[in-house]
Amino acid sequence: MAVVIAVVAGLAGCSSTGGKRAEEAREQGASGKANVTTPRWKVAMVTHSGDGDTYWDIVQSGAKQAAAKDNIEFLYSHDKEAGRQAQLVQAAIDKKVDGLIVTLAKPSAMKKVVKKAVKAGIPVITINSGQEESKDFGALTHIGQDEVLAGEAVGRELNDRGKKKAICLLHEQGNVGHEQRCEGIKKTFDGKVEDLYVEGTNMPGVQSSVEAKLQSDKKVDTVVTLGAPFAATAAEAKKDAGSKAEVDTFDLNAKVASGLKDGTIGFAVDQQPYMQGYESVDLLWLYRYNRDMLGGGKPVLTGPQILTKKDAGKLEELTKRGTR
């Protein structure tokens, strides 16, 4: 079972915003000048991430920043297999955490244990995936992007670029959010979209599958990947296939920022993972301290944001810092 646990300790100033104030708070914490007088609450984040997915490094970066500011002990664990993810949530319940952040990529497997956490009096916030199920499961709110709307934004961008046939590369079967992204593209794209399923933990296999598809279907002029780590792989497959198809992607990392700059990637759809991590921890602190909550019963949206070559310069700097 793949389990990663990280603990972040820190004392810092009270603020529900990031940026300069958060940096100042972290500096205060390092020097022992804490403004937060709340108890040292323990917050657990349990995600569906597989090993080596850099997206979740960025989420953790935001969560750790907020934890340092809010005097929170932050625990992180993950497993791509839904049953084992549910077991990790149960482990957090057993630890009597003061708050729980969880993803619902495969909601049916998570429903029982999330409701159990709520029944135990643990405030829950869902992030990234599970927007439609979040409220029903008893979560306070959901933080992330509306995946259908994000897909629709991609479809419109492809229309603007004059594209006619796209592959939607699904790297995790059963992930509801990924399926919604492809559905959204199909809603607004005037051309044709074909789903291509690959095993996301096998990058050589991903590259071979994309290359074979591009070689067999010369009408494909776009490959849309659903995660930043797969964009560079798709670009290599395109090169080896001798294809002129454009590679576009959901999410952002350093390689994607570099690809936007050199033209190997056309555009990226960013859902701001740093913000998902930061705001989820900060909102749990606000809720426990003052019963505050954002969204008014609606999801707190962090995306989508279309990023192109014109954004690449600044993005390269931020991705190297680990916050975009």
Predicted regions: what is each one?
Residues Q85, T141-A166, P204-Q207, L252-V256, ...:
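Hydrophobic alpha-helical segments within soluble ligand-binding/sensing domains
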Residues V102-K119, I185, G200-S258:
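Hydrophobic alpha-helical
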Residues S15-G18:
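Bacterial signal peptide processing site
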Residues A9-G13:
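C-terminal motif of bacterial Sec signal peptides marking the signal peptidase cleavage site
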Residues E23-E24, Q28-P39, T188-F189, E279-R324:
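Hinge/cleft segment of the Venus flytrap/periplasmic-binding protein
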Residues S108-L149, N253-K261, I265-G266, E316:
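Flexible loop/hinge segments that line or gate small-molecule binding clefts
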